[in-house]
């Protein structure tokens, strides 16, 4: 039984919103104390079907799911869209209620950083590459808030989408390097029927810009299908699509290993792209298998495991 002093702070089958980190932490601790497993889905709100798919995957593991909604000022640099970032808490809560979520954590900046951002997490060299090259403070801010959320909720598992693949990779790195007692679960990118990756920033695109944005997923798909041609073939196939698309301001197109080191000669790799369409910056990525037998069929020995067989989807014993 949960501590009577927390009565009303957690109501099975009903959604409760908490703003105070101490209260949310106490509720999560009490749930763990009675043998419940806890899952965390961190978000910045403005929820869409991509977020909800992550929530659904978390719920399928039969855990108490905590969804955090916090627009983290630390991960926005000078001239970025912190003030413009959509804040739709009431609508987000209703979406989560419909998904059967029981706990929402929605603090403000003063509650998360009562003394300001005095202590932060440095992302290491990878934090200065790809997204970090143009957003030098972004990943330190992101890792700092994720570290705080993990400390507050102490979840058994935390769920993140693969769309922000560099973010996912850095979170895994932080958890491993700093010995966080949590399992990170990756959820595949959710796409529209035409291939566009779901993003809170898609709402900034007009109809013509949205059509232009489709080149990102088309380029990634072309690159992935050229895996048998090696790294140069993958990049050439993807770049041909991007170069043929007017109105696209390419930031980077890179092929890396699955941990974002140098791309291997064969096996699992990741193709990543970032570009501006109008004033909206979009990112996307896709898994690529490099190398194929002479007959052109994919090398099945180097294929990644299907997401459904990921042992991380099984609640850990604690």
From Swiss-Prot:
Residues binding ATP, per UniProt: 44-51, 161-164, 190, 198-201
Note: The reaction proceeds by a bi uni uni bi ping pong mechanism.
Record's protein name: Pantothenate synthetase
Lineage: Bacteria, Bacillati, Actinomycetota, Actinomycetes, Mycobacteriales
Enzyme class label: ligase
Function: Catalyzes the condensation of pantoate with beta-alanine in an ATP-dependent reaction via a pantoyl-adenylate intermediate.
Disordered: annotated span: 295-318
Protein's cellular compartments: Cytoplasm
Domain of life: Bacteria
HAMAP family, per database record: PanC
Annotated NCBIfam families: cyt_tran_rel (TIGR00125), panC (TIGR00018)
Pathway stated in the Swiss-Prot or TrEMBL entry: Cofactor biosynthesis; (R)-pantothenate biosynthesis; (R)-pantothenate from (R)-pantoate and beta-alanine: step 1/1
CDD domains cross-referenced by the UniProt entry: PanC (cd00560)
EC identifiers of the protein: 6.3.2.1
GO cellular component terms, semicolon-separated: cytosol
Similarity annotation: Belongs to the pantothenate synthetase family.
Pfam families, per database record: Pantoate_ligase
Chain residues that bind beta-alanine: 75
Catalytic reaction annotation: (R)-pantoate + beta-alanine + ATP = (R)-pantothenate + AMP + diphosphate + H(+)
Biological source species: Nocardia farcinica (strain IFM 10152)
């Amino acid at each position: 039984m949960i501590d009577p002093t927390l009565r009303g702070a957690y109501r099975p089958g009903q959604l409760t919103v908490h703003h105070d980190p101490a209260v949310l932490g106490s509720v999560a601790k009490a749930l763990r104390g009675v043998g419940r497993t806890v899952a965390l889905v961190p978000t910045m709100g403005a929820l869409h079907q991509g977020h909800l798919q992550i929530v659904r995957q978390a719920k399928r593991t039969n855990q108490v799911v905590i969804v955090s909604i916090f627009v983290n000022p630390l991960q926005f640099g000078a001239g970025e869209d912190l003030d413009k970032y959509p804040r739709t808490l009431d609508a987000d809560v209703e979406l989560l209620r419909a998904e059967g979520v029981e706990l929402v954590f929605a603090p403000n900046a003063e509650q998360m950083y009562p003394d300001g951002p005095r202590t932060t997490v440095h992302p290491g060299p990878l934090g200065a590459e790809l997204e970090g090259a143009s957003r030098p403070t972004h990943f330190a801010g992101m890792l700092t808030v994720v570290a705080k959320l993990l400390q507050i909720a102490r979840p058994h598992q935390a769920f993140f989408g693969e769309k922000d693949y560099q973010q996912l990779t850095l979170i895994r790195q932080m958890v491993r390097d700093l010995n966080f007692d949590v399992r990170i679960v990756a959820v595949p990118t959710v796409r529209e029927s035409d291939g566009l990756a779901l993003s809170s920033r898609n709402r900034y695109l007009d109809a013509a810009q949205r059509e232009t944005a489709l080149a990102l997923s088309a380029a990634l798909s072309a690159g992935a299908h050229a895996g048998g041609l090696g790294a140069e073939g993958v990049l050439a196939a993807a770049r041909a699509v991007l170069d043929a698309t007017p109105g696209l301001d390419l930031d980077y197109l890179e092929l890396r290993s699955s941990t974002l080191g140098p791309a291997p000669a064969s096996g699992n790799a990741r193709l990543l792209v970032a570009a501006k369409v109008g004033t909206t910056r979009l990112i996307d990525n896709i898994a690529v298998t490099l190398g194929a037998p002479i007959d052109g069929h994919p090398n099945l020995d180097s294929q990644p495991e299907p997401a459904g067989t990921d042992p991380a989807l099984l609640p850990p014993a604690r």
